[in-house]
Amino acid sequence: MSANELPASAQSLQEQFLGSFVTRKLLLHDPFDHNSLRVFAVAPSPLITHENNLKGNVLMLLSVLICGIICCLGLHYIIRCAFRRSSRFMISEPISSLSTPRSSSNKGIKKKALRMFPVVSYSREMNLPGIGEECVICLSDFVSGEQLRLLPKCNHGFHVRCIDKWLQHHLTCPKCRHCLVETCQKILGDFSQADSMASTPTESVIVRIDPLEPEGRVNTFRESS
């Protein structure tokens, strides 16, 4: 007997059974099941994959080029600054080397002239007008027996070590500001004259004395008579 010949009640029962089976199967299906989604996922085409790889390579190449350009510009700037500084140093070095001897020569009094300034031994019984009770350079009192150097013309006295150090960098008296240039020039001029006189050899005059020729015999009066 075929299914078309089944009674209506049997067909209705069959339809109900199939409907309940389908609904139960749908209820058991998880919409968030990854395994089921994998079945329905569509595999990407090879053309899309190739385009994505090409874009990534282009971006990487551009980033490398930009980094290289930035590094080259920075290195060029550093080399340029270093070259400018070296050129300025080379230009200023000969000027400073030429100017330093003049400044150093005019900086203070020469030791040769300084040694010619008189030195006295201090005592409280001294009545020199230029010597006080203390050294104005180190601000310490004079003690009996200390060696003091007196400056010419103003006659101010100071400790030898103090005034020697002062006059290595100054040309004036630390107390009255009297200039010592003329005095030092005079002293150095006398020294240069003395040195020139000592260095020039004395001219020796050689006098040659020839022996006298023998004269003839002279007859005296007695012999003639």
Swiss-Prot record:
Its membrane topology: Single-pass membrane protein
Name the Enzyme Commission number(s) assigned to this protein: 2.3.2.27
Under the heading InterPro entries, the entry gives:
ATL10/ATL72-79-like (IPR044602), Znf_RING (IPR001841), Znf_RING/FYVE/PHD (IPR013083)
Chemical reaction(s) catalysed: S-ubiquitinyl-[E2 ubiquitin-conjugating enzyme]-L-cysteine + [acceptor protein]-L-lysine = [E2 ubiquitin-conjugating enzyme]-L-cysteine + N(6)-ubiquitinyl-[acceptor protein]-L-lysine
GO molecular function (one): zinc ion binding
Q: Where are the zinc fingers (RING-type)?
A: 135-177
The record's comment about this protein's domains reads:
The RING-type zinc finger domain mediates binding to an E2 ubiquitin-conjugating enzyme.
Protein name from the UniProt record: E3 ubiquitin-protein ligase ATL76
Species of the source: Arabidopsis thaliana (Mouse-ear cress)
